[in-house]
């Protein structure tokens, strides 16, 4: 039977410790400035993150103008637009404390309709748009995760230390070649269990089998230069995604990916025009789940143990039977 290592009150205190430490180090190591984040954007702007392209955003109209607005799914595109509007230069970046609602999320131990993450974005030069630069950025972020685990271990030694010294890198195609008989999700479990921490490179495009490792929207990540940070979760005994990130599309990549997905209508949106016409800066960015972080580092079995959200009654009852107490 699962037993949380902390009471609810102790957990709340530790959550603040996790978030404060990580935020400070993320800003320092990646040289990011914190900015205010929107909860909603106009529909016509094209600034909302449409995730895998099928999730429905929450829509409403504004009394004053009647304009259609959308609650954000993430700030993947808004951040790039903001960097341009605020006059940032190459090597400079921003981050936000992003809160979102994803109404169509499939609820389980690691997914909630409420999303909280550190959303960050940084301007890069054309020659930085390489796998090498992507990997160095991942290593920097992984270094912060390692320091966070060490920091928590000093305060709460019963949490233990599980992260390996280094994170390994593998492409989604190499992963398919390594485990051709497994589903993409089971491949993630296998590689994360073997290494403890892994970054899977290249998510969104079809593999040689004709299948995608996973879906990605066509208009923010360059599918050749993106990926996911996965850890092996000691309580769940499964792979566990901490961050999705990548070098963003330039005009060439956006043109190709919009054609592949049959989304040429997006070329008329202000955001997409800004990329196709080389007005918006080249960037790298990502989202780092705050509740996911807390769930991993505090060794929790359910995301509802580290965030307040709404859960169906049957799910709450099932959790109670497993000694999991949701906020």
Swiss-Prot record:
It is found in: Cytoplasm. CDD domains: AsnA. InterPro entries: aa-tRNA-synth_II (IPR006195), aa-tRNA-synth_II/BPL/LPL (IPR045864), AsnA (IPR004618). PROSITE patterns: AA_TRNA_LIGASE_II (PS50862). It comes from the Bacteria. GO terms for cellular component: cytosol. Its EC number is 6.3.1.1. It catalyses: L-aspartate + NH4(+) + ATP = L-asparagine + AMP + diphosphate + H(+). The keyword Transmembrane does not apply. Keywords: Amino-acid biosynthesis, Asparagine biosynthesis, ATP-binding, Cytoplasm, Ligase, Nucleotide-binding. Pathway: Amino-acid biosynthesis; L-asparagine biosynthesis; L-asparagine from L-aspartate (ammonia route): step 1/1. Gene3D superfamilies: Bira Bifunctional Protein, Domain 2. GO terms for molecular function: aspartate-ammonia ligase activity; ATP binding; catalytic activity, acting on a protein; transferase activity. GO terms for biological process: L-asparagine biosynthetic process. The keyword Amino-acid biosynthesis applies. It is an enzyme of class 6 (ligase). Belongs to the class-II aminoacyl-tRNA synthetase family. AsnA subfamily. This is Aspartate--ammonia ligase.
């Amino acid at each position: 039977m699962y037993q949380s290592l902390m009471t609810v009150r102790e957990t709340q205190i530790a959550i603040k410790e996790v978030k404060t430490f990580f935020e400070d180090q993320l800003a320092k190591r990646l040289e990011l400035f914190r900015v205010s984040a929107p909860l909603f954007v106009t529909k016509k702007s094209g600034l909302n993150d449409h995730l895998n392209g099928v999730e429905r955003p929450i829509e409403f109209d504004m009394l004053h103008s009647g304009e259609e607005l959308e609650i954000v799914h993430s700030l993947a595109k808004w951040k790039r637009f903001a960097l341009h509007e605020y006059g940032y230069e190459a090597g400079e970046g921003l981050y936000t404390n992003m809160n979102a609602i994803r109404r169509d999320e499939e609820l389980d131990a690691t997914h909630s309709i409420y999303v909280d993450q550190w959303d960050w974005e940084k301007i890069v030069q054309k020659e930085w748009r390489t796998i090498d630069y992507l990997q160095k950025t991942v290593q920097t972020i992984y270094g912060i995760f390692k320091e966070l685990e060490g920091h928590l271990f000093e305060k709460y030694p019963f949490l233990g230390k599980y992260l390996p010294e280094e994170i390994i890198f593998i492409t989604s195609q190499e992963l398919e070649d390594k485990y051709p008989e497994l589903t993409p999700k089971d491949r993630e479990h296998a590689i994360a269990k073997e290494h403890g921490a892994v970054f899977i490179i290249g998510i969104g495009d079809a593999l040689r089998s004709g299948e995608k490792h996973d879906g990605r929207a066509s208009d923010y990540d360059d599918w050749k230069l993106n990926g996911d940070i996965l850890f092996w979760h000691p309580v769940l005994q499964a792979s566990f995604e901490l961050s999705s990130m990548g070098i963003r599309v330039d005009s060439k990549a956006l043109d190709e990916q919009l054609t592949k997905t049959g989304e040429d209508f997006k070329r008329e949106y202000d955001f997409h025009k800004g990329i196709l016409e080389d007005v918006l800066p080249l960037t790298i960015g990502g989202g780092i789940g705050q509740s996911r972080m807390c769930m991993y580092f505090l060794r929790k079995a359910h995301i509802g143990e580290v965030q307040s959200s709404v859960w169906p009654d049957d799910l709450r009852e099932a959790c109670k039977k497993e000694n999991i107490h949701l906020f």
